[in-house]
């Protein structure tokens, strides 16, 4: 399912377990999302861009194929509040991972907005990469009032 946003289209895929993928895309990456969960995700994304600050925690994610470490990281990042940031190093210390491992896992995260990887920055305030699109990360952090 395509979700239009101010940043461009997002592609959504769902499985019986939850959201399988939500990410910026120029072309479909898999089967079309349908059903109640797809509609809930669409409504939550629309609410986010309307400034309503949903936390997305009520949306189940399908972590099939992910390592236990990556699952723990994604679940922890889901708890970073709207308008706040946390550092790669702080997450790494908390979860027993290196900051580079945190960054690599977040770059590969298929759950755009639902796992708010854009809220993870360097301890010195530099943004760091974000799916290869630092400008997108900057836009989201400004939109949320974190910068």
From Swiss-Prot:
Keywords: DNA damage, DNA-binding. Transmembrane segments: none annotated. Disulfide bonds: none annotated. The record marks 100 as: Arg finger, required for nucleotide flipping. The record marks 88 as: Required for phosphate rotation/nucleotide flipping. InterPro entries: MethylDNA_cys_MeTrfase_DNA-bd (IPR014048), MethylDNA_cys_MeTrfase_DNAb (IPR036217), MGMT_N_sf (IPR036631), WH-like_DNA-bd_sf (IPR036388). GO terms for molecular function: DNA binding; methylated-DNA-[protein]-cysteine S-methyltransferase activity. Signal peptide: none annotated. SUPFAM superfamilies: Methylated DNA-protein cysteine methyltransferase domain, Methylated DNA-protein cysteine methyltransferase, C-terminal domain. Disruption phenotype: Disruption increases the spontaneous mutation rate. One of its GO terms (biological process) is DNA repair. Involved in DNA damage recognition. Binds DNA containing O(6)-methylguanine and larger O(6)-alkylguanine adducts. Binds to the damaged base and flips the base out of the DNA duplex into an extrahelical conformation, which allows processing by repair proteins. Also affects the regulation of gene expression in response to alkylation. Belongs to the MGMT family. ATL subfamily. Interacts with several proteins, including UvrA, UvrD and the three subunits of the RNA polymerase. This is DNA base-flipping protein. It comes from Thermus thermophilus (strain ATCC 27634 / DSM 579 / HB8).
């Amino acid at each position: 399912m395509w979700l239009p946003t101010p940043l461009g289209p997002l592609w959504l895929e769902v499985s019986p377990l939850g959201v399988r993928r939500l990410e910026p895309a120029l072309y479909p990456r898999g089967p079309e999302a349908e059903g109640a969960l797809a509609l809930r995700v669409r409504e939550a994304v629309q609410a986010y861009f309307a400034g309503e600050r949903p936390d997305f925690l009520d949306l189940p994610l399908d972590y099939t194929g992910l390592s236990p470490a990556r699952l723990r990281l994604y679940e922890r990042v889901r708890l970073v509040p709207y308008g706040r940031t946390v550092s790669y190093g702080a997450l790494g210390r908390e979860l027993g991972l290196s900051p580079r491992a945190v960054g690599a896992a977040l770059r590969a995260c298929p759950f755009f907005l639902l796992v708010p990887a854009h809220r993870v920055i360097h301890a010195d305030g530099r943004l760091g990469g974000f799916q290869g699109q630092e400008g997108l990360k900057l836009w989201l952090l400004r939109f949320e009032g974190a910068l």
